[in-house]
Amino acid sequence: MKESLLAKSVRIAAVVAAYWTISISLVFLNKYLLSSPDIKLDAPLFVTWYQCVVTVICLFFLSLLGDRYPWIDTFPAFHIKLSVAKQVLPLSAVFVGMITFNNLCLKNLGVSFYNVGRSLTTVFNVICTYVILGQSTSYKAVICCAVIIGGFLMGVDQEGSSGKISYSGVLFGVLASLCVSLNAIYTKKFIPAVDNNIWRLQLYNNFNACFLFLPLMALLGEIGEVAHFPNLSSAYFWLMMTIGGVFGIAIGYITGLQIKVTSPLTHNISGTAKACVQTIMSVSYFHETKTALWWLSNAMVLGGSMAYTRVRHSEMKKAHTIQASKDDKALQEDGQTKV
């Protein structure tokens, strides 16, 4: 039976609302876990490691549910091959860098400035695509990147003028942006090793991360920090940590669902709008006062990102049309030759 327009609209609205709720909640929850005076645990790698452990456990139970309930067909059977885990290890190393620098950025920067601190992902996408894949970018896309860079620099300047900036947090944000770009590129390279299943790839990435984090935590002294943590036996602490891990896998699922019920373009626009609302919520919640130039820097970053999305979508659509036209012409010529 064909779905009515009203039912389809309600379903899309529900998915987008769920994406916004989970994404914004995850950012605020991670900020709370990483730098709240209530928690007082200076072990960001441990927090990130635990979320990876929770993700692996969640994928295990979701695979069991998938066997029992056929409508849950997104999650593959839980099976780990050490040969495959070793094969995707380079990608897992980039994945560890991505989530580590992301959380370190959030720990050292306010939620309101977090989007600006992480805004260079698009710029690194263009750079890495050219350097690694040898693919050039149109001048329109480069202009969009220039706007993003301008917004980033203005934001850093304005945040610095307020005396609240952490330049280490900015550096972590830049490194996180680089790792996000590298992760996207290497995902395409390694996903065939897991039968092109993004959830199986997430399983192997998080499985490898559980072990890759251990020497890093030992090197930075976080194991001792956790061992002497006064709230280690607190049920509330572990509840918040576990919720953070569950939300981590939930955002992956709801992101894929939002793309499925809308489109990649709509998903990116939704993400940009969500970032704007998240910034306003943070400024309001923490009672922050920002200058007009600070708001302008955010607008430049968000506007440049949205414009880049539109430009790339238009270019991909045009390239697809040209390729389809060439294929049709080739088929016609082939048919005439056979006649």
From Swiss-Prot:
GO biological process: GDP-fucose import into Golgi lumen
Annotated InterPro entries: Sugar_P_trans_dom, TPT_transporter
Gene Ontology molecular function terms on file: antiporter activity; GDP-fucose transmembrane transporter activity
Membrane-topology annotation of the record: Multi-pass membrane protein
Record bears the keyword Transmembrane: yes
Any one annotated GO CC term: Golgi apparatus
Protein keywords: Golgi apparatus, Membrane, Sugar transport, Transmembrane, Transmembrane helix, Transport
Residues spanning the membrane: 9-29, 45-65, 82-102, 111-133, 136-156, 165-185, 209-229, 237-257
Basic and acidic residues bias (residue ranges): 325-339
Family to which the UniProt record says this protein belongs: Belongs to the TPT transporter family. SLC35C subfamily.
PANTHER family to which the protein is assigned, alphabetical: SOLUTE CARRIER FAMILY 35 (PTHR11132)
Cited function: Antiporter specific for GDP-l-fucose and depending on the concomitant reverse transport of GMP. Involved in GDP-fucose import from the cytoplasm into the Golgi lumen.
Protein name per the record: GDP-fucose transporter 1
Organism (species): Nematostella vectensis (Starlet sea anemone)
Gene that produces this protein: slc35c1
